[in-house]
Every structure is written in structure tokens, then in C-alpha cells.
Amino acid sequence: MKKHILFYSLIAIIFASCSKDNNETNILEKPKEGTEEPLKPSPNSVKSVNGGFYKPNVGGPNQPNQVFIDLSTGEQTAVKRDSWDFAFLCDPKDHRVILNNTIKMAAKKLETTNIDEVQDIDESVVVGPSTAQTLGYVDSPYGAFVNSPTGTAIKKISEKNDENKVYLVNMGYDVGVKTPEIGAISLDEGIHRGWKKVRVIRNGDDYVIQYANLRDKTHKTMTIKKKTTHNFVYINLEKGTEVEVQPEKTKWDISFTAMTLYRNIPQTVTYFFGDVVIHNLRGVKVKKIVTNSQTRDREYDAFNKLSADNGSNEYFKESKHQLIIGTTWRNTQGGAQLLDNVFYIIRDGDGNLYKLKFASMVNEKGERGYPVFQYDLLK
């Protein structure tokens, strides 16, 4: 059920044989690495493109970028994974803070509300197979906005500020630059970013984050206001500023990233993975289609709107978390391999329906971090 996809000559043949809808004009260019420009709005109220072959700018075997893709415009936004620290939920009915789970951050609740108390490093607050999911040190990779251990590591921010505790935060790692062997990835070889103590409180509907180094007896603060146009507001503590990461919530559908997931070995532990694909929980739905390697491509070609029940809510009823694609499109045991028995159906926030399958996860040299996928508008 698996095959190595190491031959870009095959991709070239496929490109040459595509229909007019998938010809060279629809082979989408990569943006400059690290671009953070917001996507431009479409002049049409209902946006759609026919699709094509797509190369997300993941950035190679260190996978330095989070890449957000709008299928309806063909635009992507690539942002360096270590450019942000915390993200603040913009839901008008909730107050949640998430860690940067793309650089192995972790957090432990302390039994104090005094941010100026001196704290010590706790080496157990890490991402890895020694850290059980039940400890609640990381955010749920499924995107659940409930309290840990099945939701966010930082508890929901209360209106009663005396209920908002200080957290000991392992700030994770800078994106590394070490070049791994061909076919491998190097995701956490960068410099450790140290430790912080952090407390988040509320001022009306705004967030206020208090933060300091562990031994400091004074702290800094930032106030974060929600944006109705976005899922989250992101901040960088070192700069003391907000930073642009996700595009507006209506302007991306899927994202390629490295991130902390759960793994059963045999208990459920935290584990860091590359080549992960998530989808936007605000309006996007995904369904995985499992077939077999002999018929997958024929079934993909034949799949149309009617096959997807015209995108009904019932058809997408299992799309309840952001990891429907996740890592289910590839396998890395014995080398970088695609699973050639699956494809995916995606409904974007405008109601457009797409089918998507993966064509490669490596470049012509066999290096990971260069995925290619094909997607087509359902008709």
C-alpha cells in the first residue's frame, strides 16, 4: 500500500499530460522564504480555481516554515516556525492561549499567582516520549479548546484574575540548520530558547500577558486585543510585539508544518513530527477516502460533487478536528514514502469542494521537506 516517490521525472510527465485546467499556468510558484504578507482578497464573493499541482514552501529537511494555503486563490503564506511564542484565541465567547507547538514548547501550571516569585527549571517539562499526554504540558494537537490534559496546556483565562496561575514554560527550540542524511529530517537541532514564567489575565475582553525570566523578581506585560478577522493573535516575547502568522481566518484552508502530536508507545506520550497537514477549523471540512493502490488514481479522477453528496454536512460529519489529513498521507518507516491508497475531499469556507492527493514528499535528490500535492475543484 506504499510506494517510494523519488522520481521527479514522473512528475514532469504528469505535468505534461495534464488537461488545460491543470497545465503549466496552474503550477503554483513558491513565495519567497519567510514571507508573511497577508493574502489578497478575491474580487469574487465565491472564489474558485480549478486546482493543479502545488509545491508548499516548507523549506527543506529542517522544515523551517509553517505554510498556510488558500485553495480557492492558490496563494500561500510561509512563516518561519520560531517567529512566534504564544497565540491568543479571537473567539468572542472564549479566552484561550496556545503554545507554539511547532518548536516543542511545553508548559506546567504552578500553584501561585505571583509572577515575581523566583522559579527553577523543571527538566520534566519537555516534549518527548518520556512525557505522558496526561500531564497536560502541551496543547492538544487536535485543536480542542478545553482544559488540559485533553485541551490547552494553559487553562482557560478566567474573568477572576486570582484564578489565573503562573506557568513554567519551556520555550522550545530555534529552527535548526543542521543538514541531515538524505531522506531524513532535522527538526529540533536548533538552540534551546530557554525558560520563562508566564501568567495571562484578562482586562475586560483583552488579554494581558505577564512574563519574565525564571530568576527575575520583576516582569514585563503586553496587552493583546482580539481581531474579528483572525483565529488568533500571535506574539513574540523577545520583540515584545505582535507578529503575523496565520492569514485571516477566511483566507486559508490547509497548513503544512512540523508540530507536537501524541503517540502510543504503548501509553500516549508527546512526540514531535514533521510533514503534518492540518486544516482550518473555522469553516473548513475534510474527509479521508481510503481505497487501494491499484484503483486510487482512477477513483480520484472519477470523483465528483455527486460522489461527495454535494458537500453536505452529513458527508463531513466526521470532520471534528484538525488532523483528518495529519500524517495519514505518508509513512517514514524505512524511508520517506507516500501512502498511495488515500485521497481527501475538502470543503472550504465558501462551500467550494476539492479533491486532493499527494504526489511526492521529497525532491529529485530524495530530500524531505519538498512535498507536492495535486488538487482539483469538484464539478
Residue ranges and their predicted role:
Residues 6-10:
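Sec-dependent N-terminal signal peptides
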Residues 1-5, 19-20:
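Positively charged n-region of N-terminal signal peptides that target proteins for export
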Residues 14-17:
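C-terminal motif of bacterial Sec signal peptides marking the signal peptidase cleavage site
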Residues 22-379:
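Surface-exposed, beta-sheet-biased, low-hydrophobicity segments with strongly acidic/polar composition
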